[in-house]
């Protein structure tokens, strides 16, 4: 039986998640790490804000479970080598990501 690792192109340098829920991203990345423990991973979650399609506005993430510090620590322990942000991440978010990367690497 072939596992997921046998199906990955050997020329692939990184695999990751992009524009996914801030709250769900650590679990998703950990699942990738479990399936591909030797693959370098990357994580670019969104800010967690939610777009209200009726009002056509972005709403703050009232269900944000963790800080960037906590999430970045989880990413690193799950094999992330590149960490950033996607939709609606702010310069403040990037500063927090950078500080956490420096703290945990």
Swiss-Prot record:
Domain of life: Eukaryota
Alphabetical GO biological process terms: methylation
SUPFAM superfamilies reported in the protein's UniProt record: Homocysteine S-methyltransferase
UniProt domain Hcy-binding: residue ranges: 1-101
UniProt keyword annotations, A-Z: Methyltransferase, Transferase
Single GO MF annotation: methyltransferase activity
Matching Pfam families: S-methyl_trans
PANTHER family in UniProt: HOMOCYSTEINE S-METHYLTRANSFERASE 1-RELATED, SLR1189 PROTEIN
Protein name as catalogued: Putative uncharacterized protein YMR321C
């Amino acid at each position: 039986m072939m596992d997921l690792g046998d199906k990955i192109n050997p020329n692939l340098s990184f695999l990751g998640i992009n524009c996914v829920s801030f709250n769900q991203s650590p679990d998703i990345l950990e699942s990738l790490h479990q399936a591909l423990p030797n693959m370098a991973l990357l994580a670019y979650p969104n800010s967690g804000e939610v777009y209200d399609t009726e009002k056509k506005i972005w709403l703050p993430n009232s269900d944000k479970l963790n800080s960037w510090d906590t999430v970045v620590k989880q990413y690193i322990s799950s094999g992330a080598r590149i960490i950033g942000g996607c939709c609606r991440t702010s310069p403040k978010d990037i500063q927090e990501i950078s500080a956490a990367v420096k703290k945990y690497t």
